[in-house]
Each structure stands twice: as C-alpha cells, then as structure tokens.
Amino acid sequence: MSSGKIAQVIGPVVDVAFAAGDKLPEINNALVVYKNDEKKSKIVLEVALELGDGVVRTIAMESTDGLTRGLEVLDTGRPISVPVGKETLGRVFNVLGDTIDLDAPFPADAERQPIHKKAPTFDELSTSSEILETGIKVIDLLAPYLKGGKVGLFGGAGVGKTVLIQELIHNIAQEHGGISVFTGVGERTREGNDLYWEMKESGVIEKTAMVFGQMNEPPGARMRVALTGLTIAEYFRDVEGQDVLLFIDNIFRFTQAGSEVSALLGRMPSAVGYQPTLATEMGQLQERITSTKKGSVTSIQAIYVPADDYTDPAPATAFAHLDSTTNLERKLVQLGIYPAVDPLASSSRALSPEIVGEEHYAVAAEVKRVLQRYHELQDIIAILGMDELSDDEKTLVARARRIQFFLSQNFNVAEQFTGQPGSYVPVAETVRGFKEILEGKHDKLPEDAFRGVGSIEDVLAKAEKMGF
C-alpha cells in the first residue's frame, strides 16, 4: 500500500500529496487517515480528482475535525467496501458498512463488496415485463409496480409514506419471501430512529437491512450512502436470486449532496447551481437498479420537489428514470381514506393490456373514468346539491363513492394502532371486486361497508353485520 501526507484540509475536501515515483491511488479508491490519537480513530477519504504533481483531491466520508497537515494517509487499493449477505438483515449501517445500531458486534469475517460497480450488461438483463404484486388494491389496480422497476413516491408530511413503505416491506416478506433494503439519504436522524423502532415493533426488521447517511453528515457520505444500500440489494439479487425492494428516502438529497461535492471540487455549476455531472451521476445509480435473469431490484424512491417546481433539474432528472408514480394526497387523509394514494394522479408504465391483460386494463380505465367524472361533478353537488343531477349521474356518483372507499384497506403493520386486522388482496381479487362495483352488482350495499376492507367478500360480510 502506498502512503502519502495531507497537504491541505478545506472542510470535507482533503488534498493528499504522494512522493515522486509512488503509485497514485485510482479514482474512487478509499484512503485511510488516522487522527493524532494513537491510531484509535480513523477517517475514510475517497479519491475524486488527480491534480498532478503527485497530489490527489479526496472527499471525506466523516467529519475532518482533528486532521492536520502532514498526517500519513494510506491507500487501501480498492473502493469503499461494505458487508453483504444474510448477516446484514435486521441491522443498521452507515455509508462505510459499520453497524450503528449498538447491537451485537458484526462478524469480522462477513463478505464485503465494493460500492462502485458497473450496471448489468445487456445480456444479463431480463426482458420480461412482470408485475410485482403488492397486495395493496389501489397500487395493484391503477399504478402497478414492475419487477425491477423504479417507483417515485410523492407526498408531504403526515400523509402515510412511512406506513405505506412498512406495508410494502411486510407484504414482500410475507407473500414473496423477499428482502428489503431501506436507505436513508440526507434525511432527519429522528425519522430514521422512529422508523427503526416502528419496524422492530411491527416485526418487519428481520427481513430488512437499513443504511443511513443523514443530513448532519458530510456531503461525501450523503452522496455515497445510496450506493451502499444498492450494493447490499444487488448481492441479494445476483447471488441469492431474490426479488429485492430498495427504498431510497430521499433521492433529491442524493442530488443535493452531489451538488455540494461538485462545488467543493471546483467544478463549474450548471443550471440552477446543480453539478454539471447531474445526469451522469443519476444514471450510474439508476441503471444498476434493474431486473436480471437471476432476480430483481425494485426501487421505491421518495422524491422531494423543491418549491413544488417539477421542472427543477433535480426531480426532472429523476423522473426520466421512473416507471411508476405513487402520489399521496392530503385531501384523502382528511376523508379518512388510507392508504391516501391519489388514484388519478398516480400512474404506471405497466398499466397496458400487454402487461396486465385486457380485463385488468379495461377495469382500471373505467375506474379512472368514473372517478374523474365524479371529481368534475363535485362542484355542481356542492353548489346545487344531488337533486340537480340526472339519474345516470346519481348512479355514477354512488358507484364512484363506493369505489373511492373500496380503494382503502387496513394495513397489517397498522393493526397495533387501529385494532383492525390488515388484508393482502391478490390482483385477480382486486380486479373482480372493482368490476362487480362498476357493473352495479353492489349498488344496494351501504357505502360504509366498502371502507377499510380487503376483497369484495369482506364487503358482503361487513354489510351483513350491518344488517343488509
């Protein structure tokens, strides 16, 4: 291993000088520097630029407090490597793959893999478009997820993003035996802590690996932590042959950290002050998230939209990679409809007859048409009342309200709070239920029978209890 000395420290940027004739470290190599405390604490640096004259510019993955000029820096000869495999399940890691959950020590002999890899080649990719059944009616019917696809999750505070994420993790684990990897990128430490304890309480932590690089950490850690989570997910896909769910919260913070690093490295800023390499960095991350012939990594990415401006380069670059969007709407929360997924604003590339089948596509299209018409009639109803509607419109409104309530369902992970057992509804049951509502088979049942239930049989059972 070649070694150099710190030449200068500018915040999270550290320049390291190597002696003439020494082998310079490659770009993305991890360097290690020990502070002046008898080598008890070390800092990992990642090589970003070669400046010439034996000097490399690096980005620190931890705070550079305590570093001084002249300290020795060792080249590890490889990129940052993180633990992979079944031992990672139920544990919480940082960007470097160190455990931060204060649990039992992690096995020192666990397999590790570098976070920088090439995307799968064309001949390794799976060409089939297969739906990932979630058991959540509104998603499976109107905005289905593709195996190996990328989903954008939009929603403000308190609309149920975390509960939806937990239910997806639960359903993938219970029904598909699948693994989930949760990656917290540049978000609040408190939220990560709350999520960890909630997942412990709901019992889904055993099928989940968690990786955090929160907003108090240097930009280098926030930029690379998404790759750490992805590397753990890729191992389960490529070696274990699993279908993996990868949650990234929040993909905007990945771009934001890249922008900070770019400015620190002295690159000329691009549009709105973002890094000129924005599309490349996003592409390198997103292209690794895909289906191969061995398994799949399906990612659900929470996306913060700055000032609700969807033309901002950060969200706009992420949108180019998405297959589906799931929009959570506060108005639905106020109506007591959970999950509060907006059926008209959410969309999916998978909702086509070639992928989901003719019947599913026709039912989904008709559900959207009925809900859209109901949305248009709401102003008339609010001003003039239901009496001003024609008989056909009254029937449509009644069915639309039943559809709206039937799109809600109780979640397994929320059972401890609601006291109501959760339900997993297969896609075929979902399509059949909505088809029967559209055909008018359940027009005589009360609206309340459709709220917070699973299949159409649950509606009939609830109506019977209500005396219908």
From Swiss-Prot:
What is the membrane topology listed in the Swiss-Prot or TrEMBL record?
Peripheral membrane protein
EC top class, in one word? translocase
Q: List the disulfide bonds.
A: none
Per UniProt, which keywords does this protein have?
ATP synthesis, ATP-binding, Cell membrane, CF(1), Hydrogen ion transport, Ion transport, Membrane, Nucleotide-binding, Translocase, Transport
Q: Which CDD domains match?
A: ATP-synt_F1_beta_C, ATP-synt_F1_beta_N, F1-ATPase_beta_CD
Q: Name one GO molecular function term.
A: proton-transporting ATP synthase activity, rotational mechanism
**Name of the protein this chain belongs to:** ATP synthase subunit beta
Q: Which organism is it from?
A: Streptococcus sanguinis (strain SK36)
Q: Which classification does the entry list for the species?
A: Bacteria, Bacillati, Bacillota, Bacilli, Lactobacillales
Gene that encodes the chain = atpD
